[in-house]
Amino acid sequence: MSSSSYEAASIKEIFCSVQGEGPYVGVRQAFVRFSGCNLNCNYCDTNFENLGTCDYEIIEGNGIFEKIPNPINVEKLESLLQPFKKLHSVSLTGGEPLLHADFIEKLKLPVPLYLESNMTLPEQARKLRENITYVAGDFKLPEALREIRPETRDMHVENTIKCFSLLKKNKLRDCFCKIVVGRDTRPETVVLAAEAIASDVSCIILQPETPVGSAVRTPRFTQASVQTILKLQKTLLELADTRIIPQTHRMWGCL
């Protein structure tokens, strides 16, 4: 791997684990967690603030990290990923990796790139249409963005639909949609979202909301019932392949 670039990015973590969400659950990946996000979702379980250093897993899977100074340039990241072997792909996550599209565009790796995105930055997504093999795109429902003004929520929904259209499935790229379903999720909102992107994706994942913070002790206050999610799946199956898959890495206790 070689690349020359003056681009650099603030990265929070680099480590090896397995994909814990969606249709590729269980595949071995290197994870590059970028700092920074343009949203503030109610159920977010990730600290994505910019830090002066990046936590880098010294030996894949051993959970022992060393501090690497930020920002990290493209060539350095390629070098840091070299020791991780037998990978299905490299997951670009965050935060929001599309904030770093110019950086990602210059990456040259021997394995495919797997983008985990909130799908609200279409101009950034446009830059990566030829670079990404797997798109794990979220559809952030308006009720998940309660702290954002209503007009801004509408803009995010429009931008999400644009992103799915730009990064839609084709012969060289898989694209699927993940929708987090919680107690306050309105089924009619999920159906509208699914209708808007069904033709662009290989499947829709309904992900039961994972309790975070104090909600861990009282999950019934944040989680939708099994019956509710099953009923929603039945409706969406009229539009696209729809699966119910919780966050498996939380069950296993891995990163």
UniProtKB/Swiss-Prot annotation:
It catalyses: 6-carboxy-5,6,7,8-tetrahydropterin + H(+) = 7-carboxy-7-deazaguanine + NH4(+). Substrate binds at residues 18-20, 33, 93. The keyword DNA-binding does not apply. Keywords: 4Fe-4S, Iron, Iron-sulfur, Lyase, Magnesium, Metal-binding, S-adenosyl-L-methionine. [4Fe-4S] cluster binds at residues 37, 41, 44. InterPro entries: 7-CO-7-deazaguanine_synth-like, Aldolase_TIM, rSAM. This is 7-carboxy-7-deazaguanine synthase. The lineage of its organism: Archaea, Methanobacteriati, Methanobacteriota, Stenosarchaea group, Methanomicrobia. The gene is queE.
